[in-house]
Amino acid sequence: MVGVDAGGTASRAVVATVNGQVTGRGRAGPGNPFAAGPAAARAIADALRQALAGHDPAAVAGGVLGLAGTGACLDPAITAALGEAWAAAGLTCPYEIVGDAVTAFAAGTGEPSGAVLIAGTGAVAAEIKDHAIVRTADGLGWLLGDEGSGHWLGMRALRSAVHTWPSPFAARIATRTGAADRDRLISWAQGLPHARIAALAPVVCEAARAGDPHARTIVAEAVGHLTATLDAVAGSGPIVLAGSLLTAATPIRDGVRSALQERGITPLTSGDPSIAAAWLAVARLPAGDQAALHAAFFDAGALA
């Protein structure tokens, strides 16, 4: 089976046996068709070719592709490009496209239903039922939402820096951006270098860890936004935290986990979504202990 995680930062692919042994991996450029357009399909094809090296593509029985921006598949040109990417890797088997929230959830639990909160460059929460997205909250992009995300943290940091200049926090932000003074920082921000704005998130987290009051205020706001986003979709079932801000050791993760634990909820942490995609492909088969199979996939994947 083949599993693909096609995100806004990178495309990752794995080849795995039906028993959960990962036998091939690949990584290429961004696979989000909204952000990368037709180049996303080429990146997916590159990741697949790398993962399939040394394998016979004809032996692959099926696959699942977890895709950021699945609405792009309403575009016939993008749908055709994804099919061409599959074929370019030598694959002739059927495949299913699911939202990346589905693979992120499945990377944290073998249960079919629950909720997932993702916070990386963007932020979104989704209710999952039988490995399908039922409803979402936020995920609206940097202009309209993504509250508590890496990009949101960066924008909030810039606003704080220009309003508190020349505070120590403003100095941290200016140093990272290379701005020599407040006017240059304003000019830098107005250019909207989105990737570099999101890259300010670690600066905020580091400053919050060091006790900076401005950074701690921003982190507290982010935690509040993210828990509210999750509350909009969470029901019964496990809650999985995904995305770099919630899986790495950040004050955002600590704050969200603490807020949930105060309610008696112990969230799970998402693992590799490309492995989850491969597991989902196998889980579509009619037989087998899915919980045991999930454990096998992630135990094997961790060692591969």
Feature-to-residue mapping (PLM):
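Glycine-rich phosphate-binding loop of actin/hexokinase-like ATP-binding domains
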Residues: 112-163
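Glycine-rich beta-strand-to-loop/alpha-helix junction loops that act as flexible
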Residues: 64-71, 119-121, 236-249
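Short beta-strand-loop/turn "lid" adjacent to the catalytic site in phosphate-handling enzymes
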Residues: 27-33, 49-89, 96-97, 106-110
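Fold-independent oxyanion-binding glycine-rich loops
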Residues: 6-7, 67-68, 99-101, 119-121, ...
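Active-site nucleophile and cofactor-binding loops and adjacent substrate-binding regions
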Residues: 95-103, 118-119, 266-275
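A short glycine/serine-rich beta->alpha loop
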Residues: 32-34, 69-70, 139-147, 264-268
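ATP-binding/phosphotransfer module of carbohydrate and carboxylate kinases, centering on a glycine-rich
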Residues: 1-59, 107-114, 158-304
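Glycine/charged-rich beta-loop-alpha catalytic/anionic-binding loops adjacent to active sites
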Residues: 83-91, 132-141, 257-265
